[in-house]
Amino acid sequence: MKHFARGVTHDSRFFEPTPIYCVKAKGSRKWDVDSNEYIDFWMGHGALILGHANPAVTKAVVEQARKGTHYGASHELEIEWAEKVKHLVPCARNGLVEFTSSGTEATMMALRIARVYMGKTKVVKFISHFHGWLDYTIVDYNPAFSPPLTGSFPSGVPEETCRTMVALPPNDVESVEKTLEQGDIAAVILEPGGASMGYLPTSKSFLQELRRITRKTGVVLIFDEVVTGFRDTPGGAQEHYGVTPDISTLGKILGGGYPGGAVAGKKELMEMLDIKKEEGWDARRISHPGTFNANPISAAAGNVCLGLIKEGKVHPKVNRVGKEFKSALNDVLQDNNINGLAWETTPSIVFIGFGFSEEDLQVVDIDSYVKFQKKKDQSQKVVKRLEKAMINKGVHLMSGRFILSVAHDKTDIQATAEKFGLSLKELEAEGTLKEFT
């Protein structure tokens, strides 16, 4: 607490009694300041699909660092990086790419592009869907649904800003249709895999309906693929579900484990960033500075990572391991007669919850969302205790998430499943699981 207000530099890293401070990481493992070794399922908050300190990425970064870390000029690596994005991401194939320094910045850019292009201010988002920490997208409350929805607008954000965002229940087609018919919406943004990295899944049919409705009303459809981009498939969730948005935001895997983000999409939208000698254009166009946009280090790492993905060297393994891991966790739950569930919307991010059924994950309106949220709140009390038990056994999960990489293997899966079982027995003995057995 001497240097940071909460002892950490990211809310999700806050942990009681003390957070984990690491000194090194390699492959699927990391080590803390006390030399404790962990099987890591944070994987850089989802950025490290190749695992820690991947040799090919590290080599490229070291070589580039020797050449220079920042030219203050354009460079060939950024062109190669953009070419790979356009090759892999469906909505970018006949469009343009704009690099940023993070996924949050990419979201800021995408919203501004949509608002300028449409000449409108309001944006639809979905409750519990995460889009970074900017003022607009942290709005997760809509008084129109209160009750049964509880909450308020976020602290520190002016109410007039909050009112430009229309937060709707996840997967609620009827609410979307009614809202867009009013004619004052610039864009709809969502995590296509589902809320909070897919914790609350989105269905293919909902995405198809969303595409139909936005196309009918002329509203810009934005997929936040900061998590799902290059993870669900080489082309992300839009390739996986076969639904192409107008714009996509990217981050995490994009930079190969280094800072980076991007907006990619239709040319007519991305041209809002163009510089033209047209009368009045300067007053309309979007200016985009950014000291570290497409910096050579991130571009070097991103090029290697996307290159391996493009060559098909990532997804066959990481998806297979993810499916095996989910099955292993469910087997442990069943063997211990515990009312719990392991699930995924992308095979390489597996969630664990208690008191959930597959039916509980089918949220389609405010009532089913509130029901889901109540079960989630109860489940998270157990998950927090589970996380501590597993950390003590050398497994670091991310608040009920297991994020996998190509570095995870059968040894990691078997060891984690075994330690998961031991942790459940520990929780059962102390009474933490009494409501779920």
Language-model region placement:
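Conserved N-terminal phosphate-binding loop of PLP-dependent enzymes in the Aspartate aminotransferase
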Residues: 1-437
